[in-house]
Amino acid sequence: MTEKIGLFTGTFDPLTNGHLDIIKRASQHFDQLYVGIFKNDQKNPLFPTDKRVEMLEEALTNLSVNHKVKVIKHERDLTVNIAKKLGVTAMVRSLRNSQDLEYEKNMFYFNLEMTGIETLFFLAKPELEPLNSTRIRELHAFGQDVSAWVPENVSRELRKLDEQKK
């Protein structure tokens, strides 16, 4: 029987409770789930890539499925090329709303055409739908407490950023 290998990618800047929920739920469908932190040249990151890897790995230690999850980073390649190299059997994507669906439908088409790799979509839980990293960064920039929406270790790192600015 072929090993089921998933790949869930994003910038995770910062990691949210919504991301962790998708990782936990998706990992139950795979023998191995790679979580890829990829550099996006169109975004100005709050945290460097290595710090985001470190924060995600720390947050995963509290999940019961962490033995199935491996964090990877990549700075310069198409996600589908990484997926092929890893032997991925399905991409994992999260849908919060209709805007996500429109974007992901387009990506699904190209991923499938280029590699034959299917995409599994996970709907965000209703209470996590509003969460996204951009909103967390905005709220944090205006001095708002975002600890309810991010893992504790991420909240701690955000506070450290605040201290460095003083």
Swiss-Prot record:
The keyword Cell cycle is assigned to this record: no
Protein residues bound to substrate: T11, K43, T79, R93
Binding site residues for ATP: T11, F12, H19, E104, L128, E129, P130, L131, N132, S133, T134
Pfam families (alphabetical): CTP_transf_like (PF01467)
Keywords annotated in UniProt: ATP-binding, Coenzyme A biosynthesis, Cytoplasm, Magnesium, Nucleotide-binding, Nucleotidyltransferase, Transferase
Reactions performed catalytically: (R)-4'-phosphopantetheine + ATP + H(+) = 3'-dephospho-CoA + diphosphate
Role description: Reversibly transfers an adenylyl group from ATP to 4'-phosphopantetheine, yielding dephospho-CoA (dPCoA) and pyrophosphate.
Name listed for the protein in its UniProt record: Phosphopantetheine adenylyltransferase
Protein source organism: Lactococcus lactis subsp. cremoris (strain MG1363)
Phylogenetic classification of the source organism: Bacteria, Bacillati, Bacillota, Bacilli, Lactobacillales
